[in-house]
Amino acid sequence: IGLRFPADLSRCGIFGHSMGGHGALTLALRHPDLYRSVSAFAPICAPSLCPWGEKAFGGYLGEERSLWRGHDATALVEDGHRCPPILIDQGLDDSFLAVQLHPERFEQVCADGQPLTLRRHPGYDHSYFFIATFIADHIAHHARALTTA
C-alpha cells in the first residue's frame, strides 16, 4: 500500500469477518508494532478448539499441535501477546457460534490484560445484515485509534 498510495504506514488498522476476523486478531497480536487498531465480526477465536480450525491447521501446519499456538488468537493471548484494544461484535443467532467461534474463551484469556470489547447481539447471525448493522461502530473504533497521536 505504501508503495502505491500516499499512506501513513504508522497509522494502520486491521479488521475482518469470520476466519478473516481471526486473521485480523492474530496479525494484530503478532505484530502490534504494525497495527494501531483491530476489530472483528464473528471471528473464529480459538481455531485449535474447533472442527474447522483443527482441519485447517492440521492440513497447513501438520499434526503437531504446539505449532498451532502461533496462529491461534486465544493461544497468542495466553502466551502473553498483546495488541491495541480489540472490538468484537458477535451475533447470538450465529449458527457457527456454539461449535466454531468460541468468543467466550477469547474473552476469558483477554481478562488478564488484553483490552477487549465483546458485544453480543440477540437476533443477529453470521450474515451481511449483521455486518451492515454494526460496521459504522467498527469504522469509528478505528478512526479514534488512528487519529490520536
Q: Where does each model-flagged region fall?
A:
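Non-catalytic cap/lid and distal C-terminal segments of serine-dependent acyl enzymes
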Residues: 1-149
